A protein has these predicted regions:
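Asp-based, Mg2+/Mn2+-dependent phosphohydrolase catalytic module
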Residues: 1-29, 38-62, 69-232
Length: 232
């Protein structure tokens, strides 16, 4: 299940969520919150929901930051990286043995952040032109918030891609890497699971391509009219 636009907007729980989570727990359903957001750790997400009145164990959260750290560690153990992102991403990378390096890193890794600026772009472009590889936590162009739709990871990465001529590798949904990890954490096969999300271009296509049943909610980014633009 996705989080932003499905479970909450900002710090506001969406209608019906409490009843849905109560049903999952009462029926002993295996579930995982699979979020493309890389800003917070699973513990921080757990505490955020607790403040809204939902008590859910930390083990029920998996983020694109964790997926990105796992991918980098599998590609190049003990790699170094210049990171554009929030503490949730930096912490996940540290835990995977990836060190920070703003001189000659193996990777430039980008996620959501509130500290993004022109100097960040200049630094990333310079490092990539010198040989660093560009990785992004997810391909979401926009995301829902209490203020409305806001720029997300891909909107921050696009200027770097355009300036370098390099295309980032996006680890989060709809990348099957993240979906397969989610299934392993749940201990189920794809035909036994469903993906609930608010985005046709990430959540729903990820579920389809991984063989899951899919459920689109209209409380986030995708509207009923938007659905007509997709062939699936």
């Amino acid at each position: 299940c996705d989080m932003d636009g499905v479970i909450y907007h900002g710090n506001r729980l969406l209608p019906g969520v409490t009843e849905f989570v109560d049903w999952l727990q009462r029926e002993n359903k295996s579930f995982l919150f699979l979020t493309n957001s890389s800003e917070r750790s699973p513990l921080e997400l757990q505490q955020k929901l607790a403040r809204m009145g939902l008590e859910i164990g930390e083990e029920h959260f998996y983020t694109s930051a964790l997926a990105t750290a796992k991918f980098i560690a599998s590609q190049k153990p003990h790699a170094s990286a210049y990171v554009i992102g929030a503490p949730g991403l930096v912490g996940a990378l540290y835990e995977a043995g990836i060190v920070m390096n703003d001189v000659d890193p193996d990777y430039v890794i980008a996620g959501e952040t509130n500290t993004y600026n022109y100097q960040t772009i200049l630094k990333a472009v310079d490092l990539i032109n010198k040989g660093a590889r560009l990785i992004a936590t997810n391909s979401d162009l926009t995301g829902p918030s209490e203020q409305g739709i806001i720029p997300a990871c891909r909107a921050l990465v696009s200027p770097i891609e355009l300036a370098t001529g390099k295309t980032a590798y996006y680890v989060g949904k709809p990348n099957p890497l993240m979906m397969r990890t989610g299934l392993r954490l749940l201990g189920v096969h794809s035909h036994e699971a469903a993906m609930i999300g608010d985005r046709m271009d990430t959540d729903i296509v990820a579920g389809i391509e991984t063989g899951l049943d899919t459920v689109l909610v209209l409380s986030g980014c995708t509207t009923r009219k938007d659905v007509e633009n997709y062939a699936y």
